[in-house]
Regions:
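Glycine-rich, low-complexity intrinsically disordered segments
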Residues: 1-162
Length: 162
């Protein structure tokens, strides 16, 4: 008879959602400690219908990597908002109306999950990443919370290194 209260056969250490680092290229000036939360990569595969008579069969179609949301805290100095808006200006400049070249604004970002001792146990490389949405948040006289910035990042592809 099976013992339903049996403990797990192998002790393990789970990955924790509060042990992660998002690394941006040093040329952007976006420090790792600015990040307060981030989503892990997610992918979507389209299903393609193949109709035949009264039935349908499905096969996998194109796949896409979903956009990633990252939240930053915004200290006075060094300013996260200034670093992010400088990267945004490589995409589009609101003063002159000029648009940037993809080679200039697309960057490779690294997302790392850590074990309890700080060793990287999961690493993603987000290739060709750029900003699609940048929200500097709300201000409120009735609130003493830390100012945050919401950013949506779109990437060409994600590679899980390990």
């Amino acid at each position: 008879m099976a013992d339903l209260l049996m403990k797990m056969p192998v002790p393990y250490e789970p990955k924790r959602v509060n042990r992660f680092i998002v690394r941006f290229p040093s040329s952007l000036g976006i420090n790792e400690w600015y990040v307060t939360s981030a989503k892990r990569p997610s992918a979507k595969i389209n299903s393609v219908e193949i109709p035949f008579l009264n039935t349908s069969t499905y096969v996998a179609g194109r796949f896409t990597w979903e956009a990633l949301q990252v939240t930053f805290k915004d200290p006075i100095g060094p300013s996260a908002s200034q670093a992010l808006i400088e990267w945004f200006r490589l995409h589009a400049e609101s003063v002159t109306g000029r648009m940037g070249y993809a080679a200039g604004y697309k960057k490779d970002i690294e997302l790392e999950m850590l074990d309890p001792t700080g060793v990287v146990v999961e690493k993603w490389i987000l290739q060709g990443t750029f900003i699609t949405d940048l929200n500097f948040g709300d201000l409120d006289y009735n609130n003493d919370a830390i100012a945050t910035i919401q950013c949506t990042l779109r990437m060409d592809r994600c590679i899980q290194v390990y």
